[in-house]
Amino acid sequence: MTTTDADADADAAEARLTVSHPAGLHLRPAALFVQTASRFASDIRARNLSRDNSPEVNAKSILGVMQVAVSQGDQLLVRAHGTDAVEAIGALTALVAGNFGDSA
């Protein structure tokens, strides 16, 4: 399940995404996530809601995304702030919902 909220100022948006990919956000899916986030000017942060004390990390950093250790079934909070925040969250939501391009 995916939920998306856009703030009233339209310069901020967030989504809670459930990762269904069998490998979670391991190397290839994480790289696709970072590549997608990096297309946008907005500051994009991610945090694993399924793990206690998960840090909020830069979603444009492969090391940051790997640090949150997202496994299959985990819920990921993604927040964007900037002029293209809504578009960024939409693209990341589509990537996760599309299982990172995998048919499995």
Regions found by a protein language model. Give the residues of each.
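Intrinsic-disorder/low-complexity, polar/charged segments enriched in Ser/Thr/Lys/Arg/Asp/Glu/Gln
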Residues: 12-16, 75
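C-terminal structural segments of small proteins and small subunits
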Residues: 67, 71-104
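N-terminal cationic amphipathic segment used for targeting or macromolecule association
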Residues: 4-10, 44, 78, 83
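Intrinsic disorder/low-complexity detector
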Residues: 7-9, 50, 60, 86, ...
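Long, contiguous binding/interaction regions
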Residues: 2-10, 31, 35, 89-91, ...
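A detector of low-complexity, intrinsically disordered, Ser/Thr/Gly/Pro/Ala-rich segments
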Residues: 1-2, 16
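Compact, glycine-rich, soluble single-domain proteins
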Residues: 18-70
